[in-house]
Amino acid sequence: MRVVFMGTPDFAVPSLKALVEAGHDVLAVVTQPDRPRGRGRKETPPPVKQAAHALNIPVFQPLKIKDADFTALLKKLSPQVIAVVAYGRIIPPDILTIPKYGCINVHASLLPKYRGAAPIHWAVINGEKETGITTMFMDEGLDTGDMILQEAVAITEEDTAGTVHDALAVLGARLLVQTLELVGQGMAPRVPQQGIPSYAPPLKTEDELIRWDRTARDIFNQIRGMNPWPGARTYFSGKVLKIWRAAVVEEEGAALKPGQVMSAGRNAIVVGTGRGRIAVTELQLQGARRLSAGDFLRGTPMPEGIVLGEACS
C-alpha cells in the first residue's frame, strides 16, 4: 500500500519501521521541525526523521501543516493511506480527505478514555490498571474517529510512564500493520466510540509539583507517571528535588506535617503524606544526577523532621 507516514517522537519509530518491514511503500515521512534540545540547545532532528533517513525515505518538515503548498505536495504523492502516529498536530480537513482509504491514527489509550496529547502519563498518574492501543479512522475531532482495532495491556505497580510507553510503542506498530491489512482488504470495521470520554491534556509545569497533602497512593502514582519525563518535583533546602522512584509503605495515617521526613535510612527516605507514607528510593537534587536514596544521603544529609516542599523560594 502507498503510505505517507506522519509522526515525530520515539513512540512513532517502531510503527514506521514495521510498515517498511511489512512491505508497504512508504512514499514520505512528515515530521515536526528540528528543535533545540539538551543543555547546549543544539538543533536536533526528531527521532522519526533520524529513522526515516536510515531507511532512505524522503522527509518533509512543514512549519505549518495548514499550508497550501504542503497540501498540494501530499496530493501529488497520491497516498492510499496516511498513517498518523504521535505527529503532534491536529490534521486539517483538507488533508484528511486526500488518501483513498483515509487517515489512520494509532492512539495510546483505550478510547474513548484519555483522548488528547498525554494519554500514557495520565493513565499512570490516575492509577489505571490497564491501558492500550486504539487504531481509528481520523475525523475532524480530537481522537473521536471510528475505531478499527483495540488491544489492552496491564499496568503494574512497577510500571512507569516510560515502561508503558515502550510497551505501547511496540503494540502500536503491530496493530498498525494489522489495521492496514484490514483496510486494504476492505474488511476494516468501523466501531463508533461509546461511553463517557476522558481527556489527557498536555502536562503543565504545575502537574509536576508533588502536593504532600494528597494520599501516599496518589503521590506514588504521580511519581511513576512523571518518570522518565518530566519528573515529579518538590523542594529541599531551596532547591528543586525530583523524585524518580518510591513505594507506598503505609496507606493510612496522616503526618503531622505532610511532606515531613519520618526517617532517612540506608535504602529509603520515608516521607509522610496527607494519608499514609511513601519510601523514596531514587531522587535527584537540582544540578546533580539521579541517585539511589543511600547514595544521595551519603552526600546530602536529610534530617528527620524536615518538611519537603516548604522552601520554594
UniProtKB/Swiss-Prot annotation:
The positions annotated for binding (6S)-5,6,7,8-tetrahydrofolate are S109, L110, L111, P112
Task: List cellular component terms (GO).
Answer: cytosol
Please give the PROSITE patterns that the UniProt record associates with this protein. GART
Q: Which GO terms describe its molecular function?
A: methionyl-tRNA formyltransferase activity
Reactions mediated catalytically: L-methionyl-tRNA(fMet) + (6R)-10-formyltetrahydrofolate = N-formyl-L-methionyl-tRNA(fMet) + (6S)-5,6,7,8-tetrahydrofolate + H(+)
> What EC number(s) does its UniProt record assign?
2.1.2.9
Task: Write down the Gene3D superfamilies for this protein, in alphabetical order.
Answer: 3.40.50.12230
- Which InterPro entries did the record assign? Fmt, Formyl_trans_C, Formyl_transf_N, Formyl_transf_N_sf, Formyl_transferase-like_C_sf, GART_AS, Met-tRNA-FMT_C, Met-tRNA-FMT_N
Provide this UniProt record's keywords sorted from A to Z: Protein biosynthesis, Transferase
Disulfide cysteine pairs (residue numbers): none
- Transmembrane helix listed as a keyword: no
Top-level EC class: transferase
**Known NCBIfam families for this protein?**
fmt
The record describes the protein's role as: Attaches a formyl group to the free amino group of methionyl-tRNA(fMet). The formyl group appears to play a dual role in the initiator identity of N-formylmethionyl-tRNA by promoting its recognition by IF2 and preventing the misappropriation of this tRNA by the elongation apparatus.
Please give the family membership noted in the entry.
Belongs to the Fmt family.
Protein name as catalogued: Methionyl-tRNA formyltransferase
